[in-house]
Amino acid sequence: MNKLLLKGVAAAFCMATMFGTTACGDDDDLVNVEPPVEKTQDVILEGEITSDMTLKAADNNLLRGFVYVTDGVTLTIEPGTVIKGEKSSKGSLIVERGGKLIAEGTAEKPIVFTSDQPKASRTYGDWGGLILCGKSIVNNTAGEAQIEGGPRSYYGGKDPEDNSGIVKYVRIEFAGYPLEPNKEINGLTCGGVGRGTTIEYVQVSFCGDDSFEWFGGTVNAKHLIAYKGWDDEFD
C-alpha cells in the first residue's frame, strides 16, 4: 500500500514538473506587443470645412481666421481635445445653417477652446469665439438675419426643431472681440439655434465681449457658467 502510494506521488510530481517546464518554455516564446501610440499632428483649420472631419485630442489644433462648417457638414471633436484660436488672425469657428458641431466632452475630459498664446500671456479677446447658426424661428420680418460677428453667415428659418449638434462639457476661454462697431464676436453666439441642439455644461471665461449671446431660436441650454466676462455675461 505504502509503495503504491509513493509511486503515485512520484508519478504525479514528474508529470507536474514536465508540464510546468513545458508551460515555462511556451511563456519564453511569447512576444509582448505594445499598443500603437497615436502620433501628434499639427492641424490648422482655415477657410471652409466642406467634408466631415474629426479633431483628435492627441493633435495640436489651431483655428486660423474665420473657419466655416458649411451646410451638410459635421465637425466632430473628441473628448479632451484642445482647440486654440490664433491671436494674429482672430481665429473663429462658425457653424453655418445646416452644418453641425459635435463637441461632446466629459466631466473628466472637457473640450477646451482657448488662446494660442503662452499660458502666462493669455488675455481677453485673444481670438474670436464659437458661433452657431441655425434654422429655427427668429423675431424679425425677414425671418433671417446676418449673424453678429460673422462676416457672411445668416441664421433663422422655420424649423424650431433644427439641430446644430452638441456642445457639452466645453470650456471657451479668452475669446471675444469687436469685428466692427456693434458687431462683436462673443464667447458663444447662438443665432436661430433650434431645440434639437444640445448645449449643456458650457463655461465661458475671460471673454472680451459677452460670454453668451442669443439671437432668436428655440434651443434649451442648461448648466452654463460665465466667468469674468468683459461685457454682459448672458445677453
Question: Positions of the model-derived regions?
Answer:
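Bacterial N-terminal signal peptides that target proteins for export
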Residues: 1-10
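Repetitive helical segments and hydrophobic/amphipathic motifs
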Residues: 11-12, 16
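C-terminal motif of bacterial Sec signal peptides marking the signal peptidase cleavage site
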Residues: 19-23
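Beta-strand/loop edge motif enriched in small/polar residues
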Residues: 25-235
